[in-house]
């Protein structure tokens, strides 16, 4: 672990509690995505051409394309990518896809065909590079930008191609009999199932259609009945001897059989085994030793056996009996009559060998190949009459045609392993031997030999990553294109065309676009914080095209499997319907070239654990004994214990140390990134750990990030690999720093072609996909020396290069007036006033001005009927200023839309004619702030269509952008000049000059003073005697000029892009995007959580003075309910609280020492304290710190010492107690607390300490919602639902029951009519309220009319009778007294 600390590692050192040294480097966390897509695209062609994989393989599998007559052929030569038109940032801003144009070189060959002989000769060859659409590129962070939004392609887990043997677990048949089945799954093509039925007949099914006897399939492969039987059974021959038969003694077949009648030796006639005995292996061995060769058999023994060959009269050719026929008295008589004295029978004893194939053959109605082929044809294409040719072609195309059927290399490898075959992995179709081997293996399973497969074993499931998914998609696109090309080749004059005229790349481009835009696996990136990004990229989904569906997935697929160890995290998976179907890759896992997940292990050689690391997939691991990473070793690397806990083929066991071959690399290799961030994970219940790892992904980046006191050591890795924090690309010295960029002058890796300057642009207050704020802050200052990989800027949720999702808050576990009932959280006002949990959210609003039928819409400040007050935030172009504070209903962008002309009165016409054109009617369609949002405008972007005149605002934004680019160019130029002229003066110094600028004397020795007399631009005029030096000068000059022109060119390109108009959707003239930053303070109703699945909702914010306080007067920040811990068994949170309390205590001590040092300037005490705190082999760096670094470290540590307790290898209880003791605190971790309202101490001591709390992205502001009137559904006329639709509150069935129970008839009527869908009634109520009246009448709800209409549509005549009732006169009514 002792590595040299990076630039920020010197400011924050974590005390490391892990005891197990890590021998393997953790792979880059987004390698899964990047490696897969790079392998697919292969942008840079390697020397010797591209290998046959990825995009190259796709082209090669579809090309060459020949036309129907064979007169011409289109071949694929190679492909290349051009530079993308826009970079990542520009694509984000302009809503474009980040992609590179794909150019494919194709060769069209035209043949001359001799009409008589049919011989071909080449007539013409044309080569051309053809544009084949744009291929999306992956950004450095493993994402794609599609239409301006970041997306991630999730890897998919699916069943590996190959052959699988299984049984129905006795479910299909009432007797509970196990029905075995085999299934051959190709990568693409038809599935082949071979299965038993309840009567033990073997059937085959193709593509899950109607089943056929398996013997029909074998016949279609060209076998006859006798050949089938000889393949599956051995034969024994009964020879006639005297009045009985002799049969060869077969020891193997008789093992453990029971003898019914006496066994008699055919040669000697003696009884060797008496009837009723069991043939044990020992007894059989004795018989073999005695030399028993043959046994005596009677006619009865022959009955029930099956013939192995046809019994044929060779002279006449007459077949008496066929192979597979059963022998009984009648048939035996027939055989003996015909003079046969040898009878070959099948070795079937119905115990070790069953007669399944023989029974299937006799039950099969097809007798030969033609009938079998016809039968298969009828199953596959019902209703078409078969011919021999069509049936044969169809059968061949099913499994034996490489175009239609592909096992893939994986499938072939898996099949070879399972069936013990040795075909090359280039043989991608089925062979006859494969099908026979599958049937044989299935029959052996039925006979009780061998094991069925476990489909949930990770050896039988593989991962399809981006590259492979994309490859399949692109292949589909090319195949669609192929049909079109063939038709075009046949229909046009082939001699005159170029390859470009044949190709329409639309289908291929559409396939790519469709995949990225609407595939189930192409997902909108979860970008709440850096951890959620990383987790999303490492996700494995079993859903998606070609995968499972939620409804069909049973319990087994979702369950944790022993092979998940070190490959898939057993903890992190969603709660709910997707549980177990969506998983996360373990920290050290990687995906191999076949798509299986591999985990790393240390090799053990001669009983010593080495540092050699090998990666194994689940299949390979099964044969090894693997020790845990925490097994105790001595100094030599040998196990100290005689017996070691280890894993072998899915079982955990104790094994002697000499048997152990491998050892885990690290204790955290079994969990995923999110779970590895939970300290004391080993003390938490798994269900709560699952919630903890899921909730960390929802943590909102706070205004000020703060790294946890108690971490796990994973924090810097996540921050670095997610790309949130910026790492230096190469070593150098910081030249300039401001909030938006860092300029570093490189001091290493200085190639001639590269610029010597790295400019890092920081993202300032950008919006993430989830509306959280992405903001980067520089960590370096001018003059700092940086090495490659150092973190130079923090991103969202990172603090000094550590992931920082929340804040350390002082918590007390105690009830407080019922405000922490049911996991509620009580909070101090200090947290609100100090902005501890304040976050910034950025909302985007966009307005489009379209060209309508009545005329163009216009973005303007001139809006009808709007007061000047409402326009105060708008500039002259009608767009809001940056920095304006806006609230609900404020205008962001003024826009007017023409509305239809109203007919004019004659007077108006006259006035118009006199005074000229008055503006035609327009209505106000301005963009306004939605209800409930307050904020500040942070950015405005204006986009114009090509050729539309730009307004003032657009011009101003453009000028600003160009100034920024010019500044970049000038800074880079200045550093270049400084470097080059510095080198130039060094080269000239000490040389004698033979030429120079005007007025220079020859032959003078050059020095700094001499050269500096002239302006820099004239220094190039100096020439020196030494030829070598002179040529170096010229080389430097060339290099300098080239760099300068390259810089200028780059600047001009960017400026041209800025000034060019933008691509717009059809009909849009202009678009404005406004970004509003909203500051969200914590408030009651917000959801918060710790890292251990302990979540709760803020219930009340209490004044600081009312919160409980410690003896020194410190008030606690948060009160949590102690009852939330025992039942949930997440004790990790208590250990974390104690340990962080100790950290803060130590920090306080360090702070005091720092004060002392500032007074006395004696650093020795501070140095000894820090060295003692960080004393361990992992932190020996601290001893070598200079005074400045030490003070910086102390400054950082005085808030609280940072420590790392890795999962499964962290601090134990004694360590926590020792830390508390060292900090001068009570070892129980409990303190006396005083009531803030009375000042009295509480009755008992309370657990107080720091807990790392995170604010989750479930904020009450986003959820609270109110409506009086608003939009209504078109059909039912009821209010819409949900905040997004500005909907109403649902009043459902159970709520109706509640009002009925109370007898609240009028309230109920009001709910069901005027508050919902009584259209006339609700308008009247509104009018009445406006008038100040409070009477209303309910009418007929619209839903009643809908019901009537539905009944009518069912053919029922339904009339509403109430209009027909006549008013009865008073006297006709019956009197009550009667």
UniProtKB/Swiss-Prot annotation:
It catalyses: RNA(n) + a ribonucleoside 5'-triphosphate = RNA(n+1) + diphosphate. GO terms for cellular component: DNA-directed RNA polymerase complex. One of its GO terms (molecular function) is DNA-directed RNA polymerase activity. Its EC number is 2.7.7.6. Keywords: DNA-directed RNA polymerase, Nucleotidyltransferase, Transcription, Transferase. Pfam families: RNA_pol_Rpb2_1, RNA_pol_Rpb2_2, RNA_pol_Rpb2_3, RNA_pol_Rpb2_45, RNA_pol_Rpb2_6, RNA_pol_Rpb2_7. InterPro entries: DNA-dir_RNA_pol_bsu_ext_1_sf, DNA-dir_RNA_pol_bsu_external_1, DNA-dir_RNA_pol_su2, DNA-dir_RNAP_su2_dom, DNA-dir_RNAP_su2_hyb_sf, RNA_pol_bsu_bac, RNA_pol_bsu_CS, RNA_pol_bsu_protrusion. Transmembrane segments: none annotated. One of its GO terms (biological process) is DNA-templated transcription. DNA-dependent RNA polymerase catalyzes the transcription of DNA into RNA using the four ribonucleoside triphosphates as substrates. Belongs to the RNA polymerase beta chain family. The RNAP catalytic core consists of 2 alpha, 1 beta, 1 beta' and 1 omega subunit. When a sigma factor is associated with the core the holoenzyme is formed, which can initiate transcription. PANTHER family: DNA-DIRECTED RNA POLYMERASE I SUBUNIT 2. HAMAP family: RNApol_bact_RpoB. This is DNA-directed RNA polymerase subunit beta. It comes from Agrobacterium fabrum (strain C58 / ATCC 33970) (Agrobacterium tumefaciens (strain C58)).
């Amino acid at each position: 672990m002792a590595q040299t600390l990076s630039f920020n590692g010197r400011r924050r050192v974590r005390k490391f509690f892990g005891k197990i040294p890590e021998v393997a480097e953790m792979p880059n966390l987004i390698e899964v995505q990047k490696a897969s897509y790079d392998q697919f695209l292969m942008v840079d062609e390697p020397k010797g051409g591209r290998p046959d994989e990825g995009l190259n393989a796709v082209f090669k599998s579809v090309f060459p394309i020949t036309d129907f007559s064979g007169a011409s052929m289109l071949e694929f030569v190679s492909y290349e990518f051009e530079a993308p038109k826009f970079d990542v940032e520009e694509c984000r801003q302009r809503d474009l896809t980040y992609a590179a144009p794909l150019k494919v070189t194709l060769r069209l060959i035209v043949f001359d065909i001799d009409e008589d002989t049919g011989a071909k000769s080449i007539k013409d060859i044309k080569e051309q590079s053809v544009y084949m659409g744009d291929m999306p590129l992956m950004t450095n962070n493993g994402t794609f930008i599609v239409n301006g939004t970041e997306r991630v392609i999730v890897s998919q887990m699916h069943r590996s191609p190959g052959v699988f043997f299984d049984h129905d677990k006795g479910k299909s048949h009432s007797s509970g009999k196990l029905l075995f089945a085999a299934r051959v799954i190709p990568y693409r093509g038809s599935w082949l199932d071979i299965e038993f039925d309840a009567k033990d007949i073997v059937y085959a099914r193709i593509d899950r259609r109607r089943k056929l006897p398996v013997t029909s399939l074998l016949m279609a492969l060209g076998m006859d009945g006798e050949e089938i039987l000889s393949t599956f059974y051995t034969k024994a021959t009964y020879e006639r001897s005297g009045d009985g038969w002799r049969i060869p003694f077969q020891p193997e077949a008789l093992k453990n059989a029971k003898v019914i009648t006496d066994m008699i030796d055919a040669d000697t006639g003696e009884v060797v085994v008496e009837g009723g005995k069991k043939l044990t292996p020992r007894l059989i061995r004795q018989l073999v030793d005695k030399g028993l060769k043959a046994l005596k058999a009677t006619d009865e023994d022959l009955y029930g056996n099956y013939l192995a060959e046809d019994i044929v009269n060779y002279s006449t050719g007459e077949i008496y009996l066929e192979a597979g026929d059963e022998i009984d008295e009648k048939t035996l008589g027939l055989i003996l009559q015909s003079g046969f004295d040898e009878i070959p029978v099948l070795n079937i004893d119905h115990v070790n060998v069953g007669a399944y194939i023989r029974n299937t053959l006799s039950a099969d109605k097809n007798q030969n190949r033609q009938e079998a082929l016809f039968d298969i044809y009828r199953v596959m294409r019902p209703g078409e009459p078969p011919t021999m040719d069509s049936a044969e072609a169809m059968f061949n195309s099913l499994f034996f045609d490489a175009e239609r059927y592909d096992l893939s290399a994986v499938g072939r490898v898996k099949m070879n392993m399972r069936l013990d075959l040795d075909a090359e992995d280039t043989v991608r179709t089925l062979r006859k031997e494969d099908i026979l081997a599958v049937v044989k293996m299935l029959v052996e399973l039925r006979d009780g030999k061998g094991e069925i497969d476990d489909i949930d074993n990770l050896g039988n499931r593989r991962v399809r990553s981006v590259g492979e998914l994309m490859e399949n998609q692109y292949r589909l696109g090319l195949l669609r294109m192929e049909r079109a090309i063939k038709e075009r080749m046949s229909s046009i004059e082939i001699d005159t065309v170029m390859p470009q005229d044949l190709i329409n790349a639309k289908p291929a481009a559409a396939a790519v676009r469709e995949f990225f835009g609407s595939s189930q696996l192409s997902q909108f990136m979860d970008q709440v914080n850096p951890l959620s990004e990383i987790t999303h990229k490492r996700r494995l989904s079993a859903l998606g095209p070609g995968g499972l569906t939620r409804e069909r997935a049973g319990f087994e697929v979702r369950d944790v499997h022993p092979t998940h160890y070190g490959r898939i995290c057993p903890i992190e998976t969603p709660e709910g319907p997707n549980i177990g179907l969506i998983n996360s890759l373990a920290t050290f896992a990687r995906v191999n070239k076949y798509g299986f997940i591999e985990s790393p292990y240390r090799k053990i050689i001669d009983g010593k654990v080495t540092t050699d690391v090998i990666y194994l997939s689940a299949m390979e691991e099964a044969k090894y004994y693997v020790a845990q990473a925490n097994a105790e070793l001595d100094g030599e690397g040998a196990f100290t214990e005689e017996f070691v806990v280890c894993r072998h083929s899915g079982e955990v066991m104790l094994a002697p140390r000499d048997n152990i071959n491998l050892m885990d690399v690290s204790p955290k290799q079994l969990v995923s990134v999110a779970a590895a961030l939970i300290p004391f994970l080993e003390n938490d219940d798994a269900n709560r750990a699952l919630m903890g790892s899921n909730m960390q992904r929802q943590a909102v980046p706070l205004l000020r990030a703060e790294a946890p006191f108690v971490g796990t050591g994973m924090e810097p890795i996540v921050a670095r690999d997610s790309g949130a924090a910026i790492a230096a690309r190469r070593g150098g010295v910081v030249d300039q720093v401001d909030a938006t960029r860092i300029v570093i002058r490189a001091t290493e890796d200085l190639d001639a072609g590269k610029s010597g300057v790295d400019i890092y642009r920081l993202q300032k207050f950008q919006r993430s996909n989830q509306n959280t704020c992405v903001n980067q802050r520089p960590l370096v200052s001018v003059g700092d020396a940086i090495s490659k990989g150092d973190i130079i800027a923090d991103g969202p949720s990172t603090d000094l290069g550590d992931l920082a999702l929340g804040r350390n808050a002082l918590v007390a576990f105690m009830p407080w007036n019922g405000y922490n009932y049911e996991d509620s959280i009580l909070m101090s006002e200090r947290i609100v006033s100090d902005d501890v949990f304040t976050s910034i959210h950025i909302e985007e609003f966009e307005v489009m001005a379209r060209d309508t039928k009545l005329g163009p819409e216009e973005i303007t400040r001139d809006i009808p009927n709007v007061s000047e007050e409402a326009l105060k935030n708008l500039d002259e172009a009608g767009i809001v200023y940056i920095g304006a504070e806006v609230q609900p209903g404020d205008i962001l962008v003024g826009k007017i839309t023409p509305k239809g002309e109203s007919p004019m009165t004659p007077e108006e016409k006259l006035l118009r004619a006199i005074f000229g054109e008055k503006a035609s009617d327009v209505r106000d369609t301005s963009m306004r702030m939605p209800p409930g949002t307050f904020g500040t405008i942070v950015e405005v972007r204006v986009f114009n269509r090509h050729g539309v005149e730009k307004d003032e605002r657009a011009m101003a934004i453009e000028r600003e952008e160009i100034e920024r680019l010019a500044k970049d160019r000038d800074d880079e130029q200045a550093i270049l000049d400084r470097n080059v002229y510095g080198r130039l003066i060094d080269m000239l110094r000490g040389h004698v000059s033979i030429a120079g600028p005007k007025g220079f004397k020859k032959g003078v020795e050059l020095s700094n003073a001499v050269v500096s007399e002239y302006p820099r631009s004239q220094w190039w005029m100096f020439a020196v005697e030494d030829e070598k030096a002179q040529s170096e000068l010229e080389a430097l000059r060339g290099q300098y000029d080239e760099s300068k022109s390259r810089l200028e060119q780059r600047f001009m390109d960017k400026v041209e892009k800025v000034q060019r108009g933008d691509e717009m959707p059809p009909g849009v003239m202009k678009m404005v995007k406004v970004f509003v930053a909203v500051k969200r303070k914590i408030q009651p109703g917000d959801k918060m959580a710790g890292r251990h699945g302990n979540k709760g909702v803020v219930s009340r914010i209490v004044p600081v003075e009312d919160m409980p306080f410690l003896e020194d007067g410190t008030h606690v920040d948060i009160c949590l309910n102690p009852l939330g811990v025992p039942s949930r068994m997440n004790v990790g949170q208590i250990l974390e609280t104690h340990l962080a309390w100790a950290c803060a205590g130590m920090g306080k001590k360090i702070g005091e020492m720092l004060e002392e040092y500032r007074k006395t300037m004696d650093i020795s005490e501070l140095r000894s304290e820090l060295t003692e705190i960080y004393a361990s082999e992992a932190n020996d760096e601290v001893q070598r710190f200079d005074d400045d670094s030490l003070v910086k470290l102390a400054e950082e540590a005085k808030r609280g010492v940072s420590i790392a307790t890795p999962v499964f290898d962290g601090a134990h209880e004694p360590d926590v107690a020792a830390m508390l003791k060292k900090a001068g605190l009570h070892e129980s971790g409990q303190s006396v607390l005083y009531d803030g309202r009375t000042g009295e101490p509480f009755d008992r001591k309370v657990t107080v300490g720091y807990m790392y709390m995170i604010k989750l992205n479930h904020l009450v502001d986003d959820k609270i919602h109110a409506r009086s009137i608003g939009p209504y559904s078109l059909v039912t006329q009821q209010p819409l639902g949900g905040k997004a639709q500005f909907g109403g509150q649902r009043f459902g069935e159970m709520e109706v029951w509640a009002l009925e129970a109370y007898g609240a008839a009028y309230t109920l009527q009001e709910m069901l009519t005027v508050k919902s869908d009584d259209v006339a009634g609700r308008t009247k109520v509104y009018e009445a309220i406006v008038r100040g009246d409070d009477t209303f009448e309910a009418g007929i709800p619209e839903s009643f009319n809908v019901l009537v209409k539905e009944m009518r549509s069912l053919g029922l005549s339904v009339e509403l009778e109430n209009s027909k009732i006549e008013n009865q006169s008073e006297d006709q009514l019956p009197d009550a007294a009667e």
